[in-house]
């Protein structure tokens, strides 16, 4: 029997009986029994409640903690003025917080974070701060409770990718995003073309600036579809 370890990976080579004995020893030492998911909890500021049909994620607290960037009234009247180092730091902090929330449980926050990050590292003015505050305000109006139903492992599933993009005629680098869903596979029917399989399970999502230029709205959409297909 040979046991090799590289960083956080373990490779075990041996006879079937030796590997079975190794697995039994590991289970005897570290098995904590069958996990019971009947307790509500708070994780990274999000409240998680578990029920017989799945679990619910409430992210209202993390979103409510975010505050708009302070802007003096006189500066609001001059949106083309350059932002101060303190305002740039606040802008970066807001983008980072939104990106964290978005990656954890809120796809719309991912889009807002990506949109704000595009203005960081270049000459920015007060209008960027006003736009960031406006996007944050609209984001906080969205439903903050997300339900994740339990999947029946006896079903057959398919992965469905949804993509979208916005064309940027000035820079030619559009904003793109995609959602990856796990849906129960159903036999084709006349109604299948107009309905979405339910329940559906959101697996992954992303929103970012396109890495390639597009000369038209159609080109931006094709790049978005290609990105969704790659993932």
Indicate where each model-derived feature is located.
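Long, low-complexity, charge-biased intrinsically disordered regions
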Residues: 1-231
């Amino acid at each position: 029997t040979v046991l090799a370890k590289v960083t956080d990976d373990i490779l075990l080579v041996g006879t079937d009986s030796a590997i079975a004995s190794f697995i039994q020893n590991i289970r005897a030492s570290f098995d904590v029994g069958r996990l019971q998911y009947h307790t509500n909890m708070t994780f990274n500021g999000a409240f998680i409640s578990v029920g017989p049909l799945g679990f619910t994620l409430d992210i209202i607290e993390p979103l409510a903690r975010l505050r708009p960037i302070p802007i003096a009234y006189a500066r609001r009247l001059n949106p083309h003025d350059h932002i101060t180092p303190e305002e740039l730091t606040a802008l970066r902090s807001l983008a980072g917080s939104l990106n964290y929330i978005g990656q954890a449980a809120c796809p719309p926050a991912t889009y807002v974070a990506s949109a704000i990050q595009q203005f960081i590292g270049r000459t920015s003015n007060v209008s960027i701060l006003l736009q960031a505050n406006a996007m944050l305000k609209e984001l906080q109006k969205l439903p903050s409770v997300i339900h994740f139903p339990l999947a029946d492992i006896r079903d057959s599933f398919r992965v469905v990718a949804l993509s979208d993009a916005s064309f940027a005629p000035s820079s030619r680098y559009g904003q793109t995003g995609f959602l990856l869903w796990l849906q129960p596979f159903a036999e084709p029917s006349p109604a299948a073309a107009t309905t979405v399989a339910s329940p559906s399970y959101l697996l992954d999502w992303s929103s970012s600036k396109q890495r390639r230029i597009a000369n038209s709205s159609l080109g931006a959409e094709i790049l978005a579809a290609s990105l969704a297909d790659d993932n």
